[in-house]
Amino acid sequence: NDEIDIFIDLTGYTNNSRAFIAPELKNTTTINWLGYPGSMGLTQEKPLYDFILADDFIIPENDEKYYAESILRLPFAYQPNIENRYQLNHKNRQDYGIPSDAFVYCAFNQSFKITEVIFKAWLTLLEKYPKSILWLTESNSWATNNLKNYAERHGINSERIIFAKRVPNEEHIARHALADIYLDTLPYNAHTSASDALAMNIPIVTLKGKTFPSRVAGSLLHSLNLDDLITEDIESYIKCASKLTEDSTYRQDI
């Protein structure tokens, strides 16, 4: 009754979703975008949404058949970002309990994105580079204890894993400047977190998957012509991170 022309859902199948408003909008173009990284599927044998916003990297042409929606392709990356996302950093490593001379790998994804395969790769890097530390987001005590215990069982001192407390968003974005490399997760990449890192000029090493949520960091890197940081398997992921660690000139050029 509100005569809405275009309805864009930014939540999808997430908390407080109102996705099923869409079928009630009879003369409205409906679009699935951003909040839910994937197809919303069918309702009563019809697509729940008319369109999904994507790009050529996120949804390769051969994968269109897996989406109920028609694909609207943006020219660079499906995720737009503002130019002034960069934040001045007014703190130092000691403020966050990080040794000043450490090489800092960060991964500010939520803990549920950390799989055993990815975490093992991170531990491989910690073992390879004794002066490095891993800086993660503090999610909850269970995740913190499990990750630390797993590291200890695999011969890595858990004190080399430092957990970042939650802080205001501006400070969170700014503290990326204290890290050297952002290590991505799979099968659920960094999304907004990847944009935060790139805004602060931190290189991201990602492992490209086959699904929407596993290709987001790759999409952002591809749009910046940083395809060298998009890897195909866990071995090349470790190799890419190692090159960035060892070659400071290459890292600065990136």
Regions from the PLM with identified roles:
Residues 2-3, 48, 175-178:
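Alpha-helix C-terminal capping/helix-to-coil transition sites in glycosyltransferase folds
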Residues 2-13:
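Short N-terminal targeting/anchoring amphipathic segment
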Residues 3, 16-29:
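Glycosyltransferases and closely related glycan-assembly transferases
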Residues 4-6, 29, 51, 181:
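Short, Asp-centered acidic motifs that coordinate Mg2+ and/or phosphate
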Residues 17, 171-172, 193:
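Short acidic active-site motifs
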Residues 25-90:
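Active-site-proximal region of nucleotide-activated glycan assembly enzymes
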Residues 76-168, 175-177:
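Conserved catalytic-core segment of nucleotide-activated headgroup transferases in glycan assembly
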Residues 177, 181, 185-254:
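Catalytic binding pocket for nucleotide-activated donors in carbohydrate/polymer assembly enzymes
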